[in-house]
Each structure stands twice: as structure tokens, then as C-alpha cells.
Design a protein with these regions (language model features):
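Non-catalytic accessory segments flanking enzyme active sites
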Residues: 50-149, 160, 247-266, 270-306, ...
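Asp-box/WD-like beta-propeller blade repeats and closely related beta-sheet repeat scaffolds
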Residues: 124-146, 156-161, 166-202, 206-213
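Blade-edge beta-strand/turn elements of extracellular beta-propeller
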Residues: 125, 176-188, 230-242, 277-286, ...
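Cap/lid segment of the alpha/beta-hydrolase catalytic domain
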Residues: 132-153, 160-168, 180, 185, ...
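Short, conserved, GDST-rich strand-edge loop motifs in beta-rich repeat architectures
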Residues: 162-163, 207-221, 305-316, 487
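Polar, glycine-rich mid-to-C-terminal structural blocks
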Residues: 220-266
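Active-site-proximal cap/loop segments of hydrolase catalytic domains
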Residues: 497, 503, 510-708
């Protein structure tokens, strides 16, 4: 088991001879303290819900009544419900577990099978828990959130479920053999938090214990040890963080021979302390930088640096991955090995451990290269990953790191159906499963390009288009981006994009802008706080490059993003309105004056800054769309979507922006799903509907009709 970091998308004339030179519109003046739409933050208030229903009805009338919409929704649902999807599994004991939703099982089945059976084209599954049945019995809309097993017997699990897909969960102890919840077992009431096994009769619990027990970010401030048979109120306090911390948590590493307890204190999003909790409940801090990501696997401490680290007479470079023996490190006898050091074009995408090896997955210009490290008495030695493909987005994960050197490998790109293979390090993997072609990719191609941002930075982007694309500036184009929280956007097979967009004549573009993790920590840090504008300049640069290459033009360009990507496209609409015709803004942040007071918003101040500090608000206000939208400017047509049950990014952001733009007379539509959490949908049917609405809107705006 690894202790992992805690941590989730108009110009009227155009010169075709040269790139566009477009200057972003300036930010609006400081907002007045009185917010006339703050009442829309009352998530389930009668007045607010009535307002939502009225906007939903308008969006439905505009976007969902045609035969084309109904066919698209049906096609997307068929993809999402398809039995031909890959049932990805995780190994626990001798069984391989999977959670599955389809047309019949809307809320889903938690099920298992054997490896021998899983290798068959149509495996037989043993159902362990039926979420539809449970929801019906309890008159709740339960959404699966995961399960953790008690080792080494694997007979008990702690199951997390949530109402409507919210981040707040309920945890219940479950008996595998009887396929039932344990009467009188461990059970945690609904809150943002968790239970984690220590042993059969003890768990760590971090949850809402009452007033003062949660951080400003809305997560647990206190972690306790809870003994079976005692009330939750009697649990022993292990650690208390500060009110201003992001969260605290405790974990038990149950790897045989390496058993230890750990406490993690996340001071901020990119700042945490990791402690060893000894048998006397004493905390021993692991003396690695707070800004580094720290994890432990089978006695090896891995340190992933976000900043340069001066230690002794050495300087370890930001973006590097370091390995050392934890026991030695704790007593100052460590020998630190640099197992990866970045170059200007490379970054560590991920790493993991099998029993005897480490697997490194490196991005080079947003393309994967996988290598293996073998533990030897002389240190970690690099070897090629046998069977790793030269092209495609590659993901490799250990099957059971305490027992074997087996791994799962997935390979995908925008046009090639995803494959799942299994192998042992040193041997070529065997393909187990492959998606069918959910859309006809014949005549389509993937290409990578680089735009030049305002400060000269090269910004990569991927484009999916017809091989015979006419470079006349008249192609309906959808540009997607995120640009935050170290998230890298890599090519992957997206059947809904293929079915709804690229096979219909649309061009699909994904921008790898700063703020993401495509080039490591420096790429992310280049767009933090007062440098946030660089992410938006990068996105604008990609749009201008598409114009310069005559792929599209402002009246044919739409953009889409969700969450932080919703903030991105909200800013592109308000700061660069002449570049775009249509905007799909999903589960967004938009009111950056109050974001830190809404739900989990305080946890993101390391990314955006603190609006309560005047010096920081002075730059935050420049990328707060809610405060920068004005009446006398022409903006792109916008569709806002969100979820009532989103308890991470408050639906008030989208609600208030919609209300303000609507009152100012701009062309806006709004749809709010009553369930769904931050993902926007609680089941496949809702997901198909929400995606169909977005594509229906984009087609109307960019094709001039719902389908070509």
C-alpha cells in the first residue's frame, strides 16, 4: 500500500495573411459590496430552486425538443451503457473487483470475478452489492464512492456511498461472505471525511465531529482512532490540525513487513506534512519539503519535488523524483537517489511500485515514455519497459505490489479504442480487453501543434480533424482546456466526442496550457495567483494559432471547460470575447471574491490567492468573470451547466453569473442537474443528457443547426 498525496475543460473580420493580434479586454471596476444575486447561493431554497427550474425549462425548450437531440442523447447513452465497455478491475485477495453501471443497473453493481474468468471475452461476475436495490430499500439515491479492504483476510470492507453524488459520504462496514452490512459495525454519518482500517477492531476516522472540528475548507481538522464496540464520540484523538489547514488524515500501511501508521496534515493544497505515528502515539515528522509530494511503499520513501531542495551540499532540482529508505531517512543516515530529473521538455507523469520494481511514466512534449527501475544492492537501475508502445497515451499500474511484479497497462488516444493489457515486468503484456470502435474514425487524424503565447512560451495543443480538412477558416471547432492544479490533458479515446463532434465534421482541439502539469511543477507554477493571466494568454494563443493556420475563425470557434476549466472559459468569454462564438461553462468557479467562502473553496487559495487580502484581491479581480462581465459589451453565446448536489464547487457560481448576464441582456442559457455532484451527473442517463445538451448548443452555434 502506498501513502499517496491527497489531492478531480466575435471578430467581424479576419486577416488570413497573418496571426490575429487581439488584446484582452480590461477587467471591470471593483465590485460593490452588495451582491444582488447572493440569494442564489441558497442551494436548496425554494426561491432559488424555482429560479433554477425556470432556466432549466428554457434550456430544455431551446435544446432538447428536436429529433436530432433525442437521437444524440440515445446514441450517447448507448455508448455509456454498452456492455462492450472495459470493466476495469482492482485485485483484492484472490478476486478482481469492478463497479459497473449500465441500462439495467442505473446506480450500479459492485461485483467480482477471478483472473481466469476475467480473461474470458464474457466473464461471469458475482454481484456483491446492488446499489439500485439498496437505494430502493432505503428510499435514497445512493452513488458509489469506493471501498477499502481489511487485510490480509479481505473479508470486511469499508464502503463509501453518497447521496446524489455529493462529496460528502456515508461509510459503512460490509461483510463480503454474507453480502450485507455489518450490524453494529463501523459506520460514519454523512460528512466530508473517511474511515480507514488499522486492524479488525480499530479504524482511523476523520469526519465532522461537531462545531470546530472542520477546517475552513470544509474538511476534517481532527483525526481519531476508533475502537470497535465504542461510540464514535469516545474515539481517541490522534492529531488536531489548524482551522486554516486544508485537512488532516491518518492511514495504516498494511504491507507485510512494513506495517506503519501515518498522519498527514495538508496545510494548503500544495503544502503538507507527513508524520510517522509510532506505537506510543508519538508523531515523527518526515523531514522532506512541505511542498513536495511524499509517499511510502514497502519501506521506500518517494519524494516528488515541486521546488529545488537544498540538502547538505546537494541541490535537488524541482520536478525530480527521489527515492530513499524511510528507516535510514528518519535517523539521518539516508542515501538519496535521483531516479528522475526533468529536462525542458519532460516531466514525471506518474510512478508506482511492484514487489521488486518501480515503474516511471514520463511525459515528453505530452507523450508518454515508460521505463522500469530495478532495486539492486547498488541502487535503482533503469531498464526498458518490455512491451510498452511507442505511441499513444500509456498508463501502467501495479496489480498487487506486495505479492508480484504484475501490472495493468492501458493504451489509448483520441481515435484508437482503449486497450487493457496485463503483464509481468520483463515480459510483454497480454491484451485482455479492448473497446469496440464506438465511432468511425476513418478519415480522421490526430496532430500536435505549438502556439506561441504572449510572453514567447511554446504552448502545445492536440487537434483531431478530417485528413481532408479544408483550411479555409470555416470549420466548426471545439477548443477544450483546463490549465490548473497540475492536471495534464493527454489524448484518450472519447467516444462521445467522436460520435457527437468529430464524425459530424467538427474539429476537436485540446490545449495544454500553463497551470497544468504537462511540463512539471514550473509549468503549473507559471500560472499561479498573480500569474494566472498566463493560462488565459496561452489559451488565446491557441485560438489565434487556429485562425492563423486557417483551421477556423471566431464565428466558428467554441470553447468548453469544467470546474477550473469553467473558470478558464468564463475568463476567455469576458476577457477575449471577440475570439469565440460559443462557450460551454460547466460546474464552474466564477465569483472569485467569494469562492473561498463557498464549500471547498478555501482549499484552493494556494492556486488562486486569498480575495480577503486587498493586495491579492487586486490581481484576483482581474480573473473573476462575475465581476468583469458588463452590460455594454458583446460576449459569445454561453451555456452554463452545474449540479444542485455539487458540494465541491458551489452551484451559486453558475447561478449568479447566469442571473447577471441575463439581466444585462446577453445571450445565455442555463441547465442545473438536480443530482450529480461535482461530476455533474449521478448516472449514465443523466450524463448522456448533460452531454447531449452541450453538443446540441455547440452545433446550433457553430454549425448553424443541430447536425450537419
Amino acid at each position: 500500500m502506498s501513502i499517496k498525496k491527497l489531492q478531480i475543460l466575435s471578430l467581424l473580420s479576419l486577416s488570413l495573411a497573418a496571426p490575429m493580434m487581439v488584446t484582452p479586454m480590461s477587467a471591470a471596476q471593483d465590485p460593490v459590496d452588495n451582491d444582488p444575486y447572493q440569494w442564489l447561493e441558497d442551494v436548496t431554497g425554494d426561491k432559488a430552486i424555482e429560479w433554477v427550474k425556470e432556466r432549466n425549462a428554457k434550456a430544455e425548450s431551446s435544446l432538447t425538443t428536436s429529433d436530432e437531440f433525442k437521437k444524440l442523447e440515445s446514441d450517447l447513452l448507448a455508448i455509456l451503457d454498452s456492455d462492450a465497455r472495459i470493466p476495469f478491475v482492482s485485485k483484492h485477495g484472490e478476486f478482481y473487483y469492478n463497479f459497473w453501471r449500465d441500462k439495467k443497473n442505473i446506480k450500479g453493481l459492485w461485483r467480482r470475478t477471478t483472473l481466469e474468468e476475467f480473461k474470458k471475452p464474457a466473464p461471469q461476475w458475482e454481484v456483491i452489492l446492488d446499489l439500485d436495490k439498496l437505494s430502493a430499500e432505503e428510499n435514497e439515491s445512493w452513488v458509489w464512492k469506493g471501498a477499502s479492504f481489511l487485510r490480509p483476510d479481505y473479508d470486511r470492507v469499508l464502503i463509501d456511498i453518497s447521496r446524489g453524488g455529493a462529496d460528502a459520504t456515508v461509510t459503512r462496514e460490509f461483510e463480503i461472505s454474507t453480502k450485507s452490512f455489518v450490524k453494529g459495525g463501523f459506520e460514519r454519518p454523512e460528512a466530508k471525511g473517511s474511515l480507514s482500517w488499522i486492524d479488525r477492531d480499530h479504524v482511523f476516522v476523520q469526519t465532522d465531529f461537531g462545531p470546530g472540528s472542520m477546517t475552513d475548507s470544509g474538511y476534517a481538522r481532527i483525526v481519531k482512532r476508533w475502537k470497535r464496540g465504542t461510540p464514535l464520540a469516545a474515539a481517541e484523538v490522534i492529531y488536531e490540525g489548524e482551522q486554516t489547514d486544508m485537512l488532516v488524515a491518518a492511514f495504516h500501511d498494511d504491507s507485510p513487513g512494513f506495517e506503519r501508521n501515518y498522519v498527514q496534515r495538508n496545510v494548503k493544497f500544495y503544502n503538507d506534512e507527513l508524520f510517522v505515528l509510532d506505537e506510543n502515539s508519538k508523531l515523527v515528522k518526515i523531514d522532506a519539503p512541505n511542498t513536495a509530494s511524499k509517499s511510502v511503499s514497502r519501506g521506500t520513501l518517494a519524494i516528488e519535488l515541486r521546488e529545488d531542495w537544498n540538502r547538505g551540499d546537494k541541490v535537488y532540482k524541482a520536478g525530480s523524483l527521489l527515492f530513499t529508505k524511510l528507516d535510514d531517512f528518519l535517523v539521518g543516515k539516508e542515501t538519496i537517489e535521483v531516479v528522475f530529473e526533468p529536462s525542458p521538455t519532460t516531466a514525471l507523469a506518474s510512478f508506482g511500485f511492484t514487489k521488486d520494481y518501480a515503474i516511471l511514466n514520463v511525459l515528453e512534449d505530452v507523450k508518454n515514455k515508460v521505463t522500469v527501475l530495478r532495486a539492486t544492492p547498488q541502487g535503482w537501475k533503469s531498464e526498458p519497459m518490455v512491451g510498452a508502445p511507442a505511441f499513444g497515451t500509456v498508463s501502467v499500474s501495479p496489480v498487487d505490489p506486495d505479492e508480484s511484479n504484475d501490472y495493468f497497462m492501458t493504451v489509448t488516444d483520441y481515435l484508437t479504442p482503449t486497450t487493457l493489457s496485463m503483464g509481468t515486468i520483463g515480459q510483454a503484456p497480454q491484451k485482455l480487453k479492448e473497446l469496440p470502435a464506438f465511432f468511425d474514425a476513418k478519415g480522421l487524424k490526430i496532430s500536435q501543434h505549438f502556439a506561441t503565447s504572449q510572453d514567447g512560451t511554446r504552448v502545445p495543443y492536440f487537434m483531431v480533424a478530417k485528413e481532408s480538412l479544408s483550411l479555409d477558416g470555416n470549420n466548426p471547432t471545439l477548443l477544450y482546456g483546463y490549465g490548473g492544479f497540475e492536471i495534464s490533458l493527454q489524448p484518450s479515446y472519447n467516444a462521445t466526442v467522436g460520435r457527437a463532434w468529430t464524425t459530424q465534421g467538427g474539429v476537436y482541439v485540446v490545449a495544454n496550457i500553463r497551470g497544468g502539469g504537462e511540463y512539471g511543477p514550473s509549468w503549473h507554477q507559471a500560472a499561479l495567483k498573480d500569474k494566472r493571466h498566463r493560462a488565459y494568454e496561452d489559451f488565446a494563443a491557441v485560438a489565434k494559432d487556429l485562425f492563423a493556420r486557417k483551421v477556423t475563425s471566431p464565428t466558428k470557434l467554441g470553447i468548453q471547460g469544467g470546474s477550473n476549466g469553467g473558470l478558464l472559459v468564463g475568463n476567455m468569454a469576458t476577457l477575449y470575447p471577440d475570439l469565440f462564438q460559443a462557450v460551454v461553462c460547466q460546474v464552474p468557479l466564477l465569483d472569485m471574491k467569494r469562492y473561498n467562502k463557498l464549500l471547498a473553496g478555501a482549499s484552493w487559495m494556494a492556486e488562486y490567492g486569498n480575495p480577503d487580502i486587498p493586495a491579492e484581491w487586486s490581481f484576483i479581480k482581474t480573473f473573476s468573470p462575475y465581476h468583469n462581465v458588463v452590460e455594454n459589451r458583446k460576449y459569445p453565446n454561453v451555456l452554463f451547466t452545474t449540479s444542485t448536489r455539487d458540494d465541491r464547487v458551489h452551484p451559486g457560481h453558475a447561478r449568479k453569473m447566469m442571473a447577471k448576464m441575463e439581466a444585462q441582456g446577453h445571450s445565455v442559457l442555463y441547465y442545473e442537474n438536480i443530482e450529480g455532484g461535482h461530476g455533474g451527473a449521478a448516472n449514465n442517463k443523466q450524463s448522456a443528457f448533460m452531454q447531449a445538451i452541450a453538443y446540441s448548443f455547440l452545433k446550433k452555434q457553430l454549425f448553424g443547426k443541430e447536425s450537419q
